[in-house]
């Protein structure tokens, strides 16, 4: 199992022209995440995405260190990004090739240099996710659920050790949200899941409640979700 460590991490952002030169997006946070499935929950704008993005270097700490399996994200960014897959809320941002098969092929470019073998491997990936019939379709003609599944298939095809998913079910209908949720929770990889779906959070092994740029509760999902519900209802 993987290990994600945050050592006194602070994230600040400049606010050009704003009343204050810098805002704190994440207050000093120290975490040691070794559980298989870690949920990040909390209100809009609380800092969940920021926390999730720190894990693969999409957000850099202003101070402190993020370490994934012993690799400092700031120093070994490329190596970390090969081990840490990322799935966004809106899969469109990560589907960049004209057709479904080409998109999976792009994900596989580091693993298989030979074009034909890569296309074959891409077809196998699609088949294993039930997407074989869509191979030659434009990604823009897919439904939201198909697109999210394709984005996930592309990332998982690279066999990452950790998967970070930032609200991956938010745009999906109930059936697709359940399908993607079940898939994520069944992965062998360590999962960091930022989500507003508290039922999904409850099925994780650990939950962190983020509020106003700080982790305010951390522990068993049932307790953390109960705490969130109690505080959210005022
Ligand atoms: N680069 C930046 N510059 C200024 N402010 C930022 C920057 N990135 C994030 N923020 C702010 O930091 C706060 C936390 O944002 P973040 O996206 O991490 O929240 P979130 O919990 O994922 O929200 P949501 O549930 O709405 O997706 C928000 O107020 C956001 O506007």
Name each model feature, range by range.
Residues 56:
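Helix-to-loop junction immediately C-terminal to a conserved catalytic motif
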Residues 138-142, 146:
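Conserved ABC ATPase signature
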Residues 64-75, 80:
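Conserved ABC transporter NBD signature motif
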Residues 163-166:
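Catalytic Walker B motif of ABC-type/P-loop ATPase nucleotide-binding domains
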Residues 116-134:
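Conserved ABC ATPase "signature" region
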Residues 214-234:
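Conserved beta-strand-loop-alpha-helix hinge in the C-terminal portion
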């Amino acid at each position: 199992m993987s290990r994600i460590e945050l050592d006194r991490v602070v994230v600040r952002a400049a606010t050009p022209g704003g009343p204050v030169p810098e805002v704190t997006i994440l207050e000093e946070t120290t975490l040691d995440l070794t559980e298989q499935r870690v949920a990040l929950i909390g209100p809009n704008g609380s800092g969940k995405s920021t926390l999730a993005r720190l894990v693969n270097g999409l957000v850099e700490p202003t101070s402190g260190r993020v370490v994934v399996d012993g690799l400092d994200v700031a120093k070994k960014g490329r190596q970390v990004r090969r081990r840490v897959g990322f799935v966004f809320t809106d899969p469109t941002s990560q589907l960049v090739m004209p057709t479904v098969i080409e998109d999976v092929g792009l994900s596989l470019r580091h693993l298989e240099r030979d074009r034909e073998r890569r296309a074959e491997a891409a077809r196998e990936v699609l088949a294993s996710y039930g997407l074989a019939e869509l191979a030659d379709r434009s990604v823009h003609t897919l439904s939201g659920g198909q697109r999210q599944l394709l984005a996930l298939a592309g990332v998982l095809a690279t066999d990452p050790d950790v998967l970070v998913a930032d609200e991956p079910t938010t745009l999906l209908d109930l059936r697709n949200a359940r399908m993607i949720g079940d898939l994520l929770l069944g992965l062998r990889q360590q999962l960091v899941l930022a989500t507003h779906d508290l039922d999904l959070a409850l099925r994780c092994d650990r939950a962190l409640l983020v509020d106003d740029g700080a982790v305010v509760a951390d522990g068993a999902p049932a307790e953390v979700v109960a705490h969130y519900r109690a505080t959210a209802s005022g």
